[in-house]
Amino acid sequence: MMGRRERMEELDILAEAKRRFISVLQSRREAGGESIDLEEEVIVSGPLSSREALGQPCREDFPLLRGKEVLMQAVCSGAAGQAFTSDSGRFRGTLADVMQMPLNGSFERAVLIATMNASLRSLGLIEKTVHCKDEGPKRCASCMSEWIEEQDCERVGLIGMQPALLEALIQALGPDKVMISDLAEAGSVRFGVKVLDGMDCSEMFKSCQLILITGSTLANGTVDDLLLKARQHKRRVVFYGTTCAGASFLLGWERWCPCSD
């Protein structure tokens, strides 16, 4: 008989996060606590310009700056939440409208993700839902160098191209102890490490004790298979970034994002 976690992984994990999000709103409303009405307006703007998203970072190789992805921002009940995705667009409607949207494409999934991030932040349940800017990415890389040396792992895998974090991991551990996968940059070599195909990273889960996963996998729909592989190989998973802020709270994921706002 399948356990609760196994049953969840048979579903679309983002759909499960949405179900739990609705449950949080309902339970808080029934308890007389602060909640958000489903008729609350949601405005999703995107894509944000590079200046709006990152300010003036000290490096120019971020995927957003190279046109590999876009950053969308939702505002709900006075709070902002963001989501990286490959598909851009705009949305204006109610929270109920967002909950009724099918999760068929990356745009619709990103609207839901950004909206949950904004809503949960407005309720004070999560923080760090807005990407760091200017010197923030540099500080983030410095934090990663210190953090990874405290972790008990021989090899680490990074899913999703975040060049500052990749460089920090390699400088801390060495290129032989770091693996990287990415959908857009598969086959390239970054900082002496070959980028694996993001759709086929089984070798990473076999070899690495710790897997760092970008929250963007929620929007592109690859997160389900990645978590299944992690469970099969009994690997520790840590999600990083702002995109996964709400889902990490709702699903009990470990998350690392020290420098976001």
Feature locations, PLM:
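Electropositive, gly/pro-rich neighborhoods at or near active sites that engage anionic ligands
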Residues: M2-P163, A168
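NAD(P)-binding Rossmann-fold cofactor-contacting core
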Residues: P175-V189
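An anion/phosphate-binding loop that grips the pyrophosphate of nucleotide cofactors and donors
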Residues: C208
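C-terminal functional extensions of proteins
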Residues: T222-D261
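A short SAM/SAH-binding and catalytic strip from SAM-dependent methyltransferases
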Residues: G215-L218
